[in-house]
């Protein structure tokens, strides 16, 4: 079986909450219709991934609640988010922002911490899912902290795997944590894989050995609880959605170096 994927925009965590991705969604969050709100910590809440996640939380107030929000420097946006979503804790990496951030949320019973180390500790506070959306290597300490605590981490930070893949996956395996890709093509692969492993590749586009592409559907949305053997997937053909080579002529690709 071959999986063909082409995504032109970041789907982040949004499609995981969409009906078309119900199998993957239920694997990450459990049954969001159970009546018990899923607790989220959002690392990088003032960035693109964080804002997209909060938009879904706002649209589904009975399904999700915010335990902690973490940002880098934008204390004004973080304070506004905190007043709307009422987390128990918020963190700002920029220690100089601690004073104004505390003043902005005073009287709302929200614990405020500052500094990269303290923000990383917030990632270990028990929740259902930690959304890791901090950009670059700055996001690595909080990802490691979450996995060391056995958390389920919705990972939008590719740099964590590029720079410390063995450490990240090792911590997840050693402590019962889970890594869930939620950024762009990585999430697309995950969702297709979960659908394929559950009753025949739900809602994905597949191509057989002859290259013909066909749509398949399966209406079963029950959660997957076991690990899945990828041996049945022969090849993944992943087209780029952007990056530094987006406008490069095809004839120049042979000159690309690591």
State what each model feature region is.
Residues 67-105, 110-111, 116, 123:
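Glycine-rich nucleotide/cofactor/substrate-binding loop typically near the N-terminus or early
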Residues 24-90:
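N-terminal Rossmann-like dinucleotide-binding module
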Residues 194-203, 221-258:
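Conserved anion/nucleotide-ligand pocket segment
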Residues 114-145:
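Beta-loop-alpha module in the N-terminal Rossmann-like domain of NAD(P)-dependent dehydrogenases
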């Amino acid at each position: 079986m071959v999986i063909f994927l082409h995504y032109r925009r970041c789907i982040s965590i949004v499609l995981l909450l969409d009906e078309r991705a119900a199998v993957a969604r239920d694997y990450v969050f459990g049954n969001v219709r159970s009546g018990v709100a899923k607790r989220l910590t959002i690392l990088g809440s003032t960035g693109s991934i964080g804002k997209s996640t909060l938009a879904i939380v706002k649209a589904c107030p009975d399904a999700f609640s915010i335990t902690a929000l973490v940002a880098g420097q934008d204390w004004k946006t973080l304070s506004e988010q905190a007043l709307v979503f009422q987390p128990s804790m918020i963190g700002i990496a920029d220690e100089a922002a601690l004073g104004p951030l505390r003043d902005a949320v005073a009287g709302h019973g929200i614990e405020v911490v500052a500094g990269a180390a303290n923000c990383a500790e917030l990632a270990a506070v028990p929740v259902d899912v930690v959304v890791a959306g901090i950009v670059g290597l700055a996001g690595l300490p909080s990802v490691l902290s979450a996995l060391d605590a056995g958390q389920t981490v919705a990972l939008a930070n590719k740099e964590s795997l590029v720079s410390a893949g063995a450490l990240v996956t090792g911590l997840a395996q050693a402590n019962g944590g889970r890594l869930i890709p939620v950024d762009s093509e990585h999430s697309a692969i995950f969702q297709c894989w979960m659908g394929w492993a559950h009753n025949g590749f739900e809602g994905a586009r597949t191509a057989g050995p002859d290259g013909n592409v066909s749509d398949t559907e399966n209406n079963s949305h029950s959660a997957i609880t076991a690990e899945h053997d990828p041996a049945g997937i022969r090849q993944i053909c992943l087209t780029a959605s952007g990056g530094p080579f987006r406008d490069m002529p095809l004839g120049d690709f042979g000159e690309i170096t690591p």
